[in-house]
Amino acid sequence: MVLPGHVAAQNRRARHEYFIVSEVEAGIMLVGTEVKSLRVGKGNINEAFAGPMQGELFLFNAYIPEYQSKMPFPHETRRPRKLLLHKREMAKLMSAITKDGMTLVPLDIHFGQRGIAKIQLGLAKGKKLHDKREAIKERDWNRDKARLMRDKG
């Protein structure tokens, strides 16, 4: 069971694949069995992305499996889910997506203090292969540096 403030689903590849320029927290419209499934810790947003549809922002390709119970209430597992944002925030994000060629990547789905499902979105720009290699080299160097300092001191 996922407690308030804890992460229900996380996109661990997002920070490796993209430069995260800014982060935004949004509400997400879910049906009851989707919420129950997320509370159990099921759900996958590794292949998900957010984008405009009919003047609104939606989360596409997020996988939330059906909740297993005695009374099945089936829902579509990869349906587009509406994101709940203020109009100003939505306009800012839509202009960044269309004009600047950026992407909205879901970073995690968590439950707020009142038990409401929230999604953390990152406004991101894609990394090239050499950027990924540079990040790996820097991470390895920091790890080696910490190891040297620990062994020496």
From Swiss-Prot:
The reply to whether RNA-binding figures as a keyword in the UniProt entry is yes
Key words of the record: Cytoplasm, RNA-binding
Q: Which GO terms describe its biological process?
A: trans-translation
Q: Where in the cell is it found?
A: Cytoplasm
Query: Disulfide bonds, which pairs?
Result: none
A Gene Ontology CC term for this entry?
cytosol
Q: Which GO terms describe its molecular function?
A: RNA binding
Q: Which Pfam families match?
A: SmpB
* RNA-binding is among the record's keywords: yes
Family affiliation? Belongs to the SmpB family.
**Free-text function comment from the UniProt entry:** Required for rescue of stalled ribosomes mediated by trans-translation. Binds to transfer-messenger RNA (tmRNA), required for stable association of tmRNA with ribosomes. tmRNA and SmpB together mimic tRNA shape, replacing the anticodon stem-loop with SmpB. tmRNA is encoded by the ssrA gene; the 2 termini fold to resemble tRNA(Ala) and it encodes a 'tag peptide', a short internal open reading frame. During trans-translation Ala-aminoacylated tmRNA acts like a tRNA, entering the A-site of stalled ribosomes, displacing the stalled mRNA.
Which HAMAP family does the annotation name?
Answer: SmpB
Return the protein name. SsrA-binding protein
**Which species is listed as the source?**
Paramagnetospirillum magneticum (strain ATCC 700264 / AMB-1)
Species classification = Bacteria, Pseudomonadati, Pseudomonadota, Alphaproteobacteria, Rhodospirillales
The gene name reads smpB
